[in-house]
Amino acid sequence: MAHKKGTGSTRNGRDSNSKRLGVKAFGGESVTAGSILIRQRGTSVLPGVNVGKGKDDTLFALTDGFVKFESIKRGLRNRKRINITAAV
């Protein structure tokens, strides 16, 4: 019989670094061309007018202007789209 408690092992003890996803420029905000608007995984928000999409689904401004979100009906679910309206 052991007179000392055996050391157990665990499969925990690690965690991944946060990826800092989310909206970076909110509705009505002024942005410049090239500004990152949303970092996302997949296209939960679709690119609209004057908005580009990177290979990692990041949305960015193609022109200077103001951020405008809109809801669109697509299929059975509503989707969001982000546009850049021209700065006046």
UniProtKB/Swiss-Prot annotation:
An example GO CC term for this entry is: cytosolic large ribosomal subunit
Tell me which Gene Ontology terms the entry assigns under biological process.
translation
| Region annotation Disordered: where it falls in the sequence | 1-23
Q: Which Gene3D superfamilies match?
A: 2.40.50.100
Please, which domain of life does this record's source organism belong to? Bacteria
Cross-referenced PROSITE patterns, in alphabetical order? Answer: RIBOSOMAL_L27
GO MF, one term, reads: structural constituent of ribosome
What Pfam families does the database record attribute to this sequence? Ribosomal_L27
Q: Respond yes or no to whether keyword NAD is given for this record.
A: no
Q: Give the matching InterPro entries.
A: Ribosomal_bL27, Ribosomal_bL27_CS
Q: Which UniProt keywords apply?
A: Ribonucleoprotein, Ribosomal protein
What PANTHER family is this protein classified in?
LARGE RIBOSOMAL SUBUNIT PROTEIN BL27M (PTHR15893:SF0), RIBOSOMAL PROTEIN L27 (PTHR15893)
Under the heading NCBIfam families, the entry gives: L27
Give the family, as the similarity comment puts it: Belongs to the bacterial ribosomal protein bL27 family.
Q: Write down the HAMAP family for this protein, in alphabetical order.
A: Ribosomal_bL27
Q: What is this protein called?
A: Large ribosomal subunit protein bL27
